[in-house]
Swiss-Prot record:
InterPro entries: Ribosomal_uS19, Ribosomal_uS19_bac-type, Ribosomal_uS19_CS, Ribosomal_uS19_SF. Pfam families: Ribosomal_S19. GO terms for molecular function: rRNA binding; structural constituent of ribosome. GO terms for cellular component: cytoplasm; small ribosomal subunit. Transmembrane segments: none annotated. This is Small ribosomal subunit protein uS19. Belongs to the universal ribosomal protein uS19 family. Keywords: Ribonucleoprotein, Ribosomal protein, RNA-binding, rRNA-binding. Protein S19 forms a complex with S13 that binds strongly to the 16S ribosomal RNA. One of its GO terms (biological process) is translation. The keyword RNA-binding applies.
């Protein structure tokens, strides 16, 4: 179930203030954030966010196609480990 349309999108006020301040000073340094649920708005385009994935901060560069999505969608929290396969250890036991 999504967020109610009458409430509008969730945008972290601190992030929005930092981006607006950087836009006026034309700075482009990465912004560190834990707000994975924050919706990407057009003001974020061209900025890099360091989004926390539960363990470390991953860089996410914002483009036009990302507007409307959440920051957390681009910072994966899980690592896929491959199944099976031939390794030295598995062949040495035979």
């Amino acid at each position: 179930m999504g967020r109610s349309t009458k409430k509008g999108p969730f945008i972290d006020n601190n992030l929005l203030e930092k981006v607006q301040k950087m836009n006026t000073s034309s700075e482009k340094k990465p912004i560190k954030t834990w707000a994975r649920a924050c919706t990407i708005v057009p003001e974020f385009i061209g900025h890099t966010f360091m989004v926390h994935n539960g363990k470390k901060f991953l860089p996410v560069y914002i483009t036009e196609r990302m507007v409307g999505h959440k920051l957390g969608e681009f910072s994966f929290t899980r690592v896929f480990k491959t199944h099976g396969g031939m390794t030295k250890e598995s062949t040495a036991l035979k």
